[in-house]
Amino acid sequence: MPILSKLNKRVRARVEEDDFEHFSQESASDGSELGEEDEETDDSDGSTSESDDGSGRDGDESENEDLESDSASDANSDITSSLNNISFGALAKAQASLGKRKRSTTLTADIASKRPKGPSRSPPAPSSKEDQKYPNATKPPQKLSHRTSKHAPTIQSSRHAVTRKRTVIETPAIPQARDPRFDSVVLNHSTNGNPSIATNATIHASKNYAFLNSYRTEELSQLRKRLQNLQREKSKDTHDEREIERLKRQITSMSDRMQTFERKEMEREVLAGHRRKEREAIREGKKSQPWFLKKGDVKREVVTRRFTEMSGKEKQRALERRRKKIASKEKKEMPWARRGVE
């Protein structure tokens, strides 16, 4: 204790002023010895006092901690005893009064609704000068809002990748020509709104304008006669030679177009005949489900029909053309000879 340390402290008597000179003369010889003894005693007294003070403080802190721990343990024991006495019915009522747990999105929505509605700050609109300067400038990317829950549908951007081709000069929009023969709107109007005709516009257009094929055949025959006349004259004029080349190109293009029309018409006939057979088989009960032809099967059937309808000379020409085509393809696929090999 601090009081005991003060009582145990060694104190030296105060020297009077009148006896100071006498004391100084007597103690002149023993001054050094007394000084050393006083220093040692002072050091020992200081250490004992410090130790006594430290022990006193530690004792006070330990007593305070013991009191706090006792009070906390008493409070915890009271709380646990009160919780043990609560019934399950009271706990259920308390939970029902609190309500179900809400999601964070509803809380944020409530907070946003409670906020004062002020004038929303919109981004500054670009000036007309900037629009004229950069007409093809892309808009800044917008951040996608997150889903409200994991069960909500995913949010995906409708933006597409920008093409690497740069448009230097924007061409004006040119109105495209519309052919009424192949227009579904015109065919639908002319057929009293029949949807099957509107969907198969090309088929019905070819049926409606089938008389044009006769005009094409007549025009093709006239071009061939004109070409024969120019070739008979055998003039060395450059103008006639150019005309002959032009007529040849026109005849080949028209003949190829006629062949494509015939081939498509034959494909339609093959498909129509196959569908007719399948319907009859289903009606008779021979089949439960129809069988649909593939594109390769249709092409094979068309080739066989065309080959059977050809005459002897036409068959030979077709076979020779086919042989040359296969030979050229095989020649391209053959490896080239090495340089060092003879």
Swiss-Prot record:
GO terms for biological process: maturation of SSU-rRNA from tricistronic rRNA transcript (SSU-rRNA, 5.8S rRNA, LSU-rRNA). The keyword Transferase does not apply. It is found in: Nucleus, Nucleolus. Residues 33-53, 60-71 have a biased composition (Acidic residues). It holds the Pfam family RRP36. Its main location: nucleus. It comes from the Eukaryota. One of its GO terms (cellular component) is nucleolus. InterPro entries: RRP36. Residues 1-81, 93-177, 309-342 are annotated as: Disordered. Associates with 90S and pre-40S pre-ribosomal particles. Component of the 90S pre-ribosome involved in the maturation of rRNAs. Required for early cleavages of the pre-RNAs in the 40S ribosomal subunit maturation pathway. This is rRNA biogenesis protein RRP36. It comes from Paracoccidioides brasiliensis (strain Pb18).
